[in-house]
Amino acid sequence: MAKKGMVEREKKRQRLVAKYAHKRQALLEQISQASSQQERMDLHRQLQRLPRNSAPTRLRNRCWVTGRSRGYYRDFGLSRHVLREMAHEGLLPGVTKSSW
C-alpha cells in the first residue's frame, strides 16, 4: 500500500490540473495563434507562471484501493494485485478465469 502522503499528493495534483485546465488550454491556443515571436514568448511566460503541478503530465495513475502506481489497469482503475483478488472473489462483473 502506498504511503498516505503520496496518495494525497496525487489527489492535490488532480485538483490543480482540474482547476487550471481551462486557463492552460486557452494559453496554449493563444500561443499557437500568436503572430509575433514576442507575443508568443509573453504567452509562454504566462504559461510557465502556472503551478508546476497543474500540468497533466505530472499525474500518475494509481490504484483506487491501495494507491499503488505500478501494475495499473486503466479499465478497472486497479493494480494487478487487487485486480486478481477481486476477480477471484467475483467482485468484477464480466471477468472470468481463462480456459482453453
Swiss-Prot record:
One of its GO terms (biological process) is translation. Pfam families: Ribosomal_S14. GO terms for molecular function: rRNA binding; structural constituent of ribosome. The keyword rRNA-binding applies. It comes from the Bacteria. Part of the 30S ribosomal subunit. Contacts proteins S3 and S10. Belongs to the universal ribosomal protein uS14 family. This is Small ribosomal subunit protein uS14.
